[in-house]
Amino acid sequence: MENQPKLNSSKEVIAFLAERFPQCFSAEGEARPLKIGIFQDLVERVEGEMNLSKTQLRSALRLYTSSWRYLYGIKPGATRVDLDGNPCGVLEEQHVEHARKQLEEAKARVQAQRAEQQAKKREAAGAEGEENGAERRERKPRPAPRRKDNAERKPRAAKPAAAAKPSRPAREERHTPVSDITALSVGQAIKVKAGNNAMDATVQEITKDGVRVQLTSGMSMIVRAEHLVF
């Protein structure tokens, strides 16, 4: 007796009873209505087996008779059975009505529990969404502060000046050199060569040393023939 295994839960006890009394108890499917007073029969026949106590038997029997599949089996005209499956009378109407109310209450409790769980899930999801939204708002970069009108502005870097295009050389004027100063006359306009340039001048006098001319600036000078051009 001491070496027998011990059943720890009411479900294990029900499984044991379904195996020990298959004509009375069932582990699955619709259950048959039990004989009134069947608890005492159980105590007499199985107490001590599997180290079962009265408390364990009572708890297992209460769980079995309050299950939905047992309450579904409490129908008008159904017959109660004893541990060996023998009929023990037809169900009374008050017992059928009591089972129906128990089933409705059990279903209502389950629906209420499901609704409560769904509400908690929605509440948790809403709180999580608000938390994520707050994190996104915190992570959003703030706009840069507007610069005040009187704030010192940093000078912009000057753009490199575009390279000046090389100027085209002035078209060189071609002049005719004076080969014979005797051909000149006083008051005649002429040009005096000074390097690559030619300055306007007026003939004032023709001498043996050259020609005296007056520049537009008013300065007079004697110039040799090789420095005069037309």
From Swiss-Prot:
Residues 106-181 are annotated as: Disordered. This is RNA chaperone ProQ. The keyword RNA-binding applies. InterPro entries: ProQ, ProQ/FinO, ProQ/FinO_sf, ProQ_C. RNA chaperone with significant RNA binding, RNA strand exchange and RNA duplexing activities. May regulate ProP activity through an RNA-based, post-transcriptional mechanism. Keywords: Chaperone, Cytoplasm, RNA-binding. PANTHER family: RNA CHAPERONE PROQ (PTHR38106:SF1). Residues 146-155 have a biased composition (Basic and acidic residues). HAMAP family: ProQ. GO terms for molecular function: RNA strand annealing activity; RNA strand-exchange activity. It is found in: Cytoplasm. Pfam families: ProQ (PF04352), ProQ_C (PF17516). Belongs to the ProQ family. It comes from Cronobacter sakazakii (strain ATCC BAA-894). The gene is proQ. NCBIfam families: PRK04950.1. GO terms for cellular component: cytosol. Its main location: cytoplasm. Residues 158-167 have a biased composition (Low complexity). It comes from the Bacteria. One of its GO terms (biological process) is post-transcriptional regulation of gene expression.
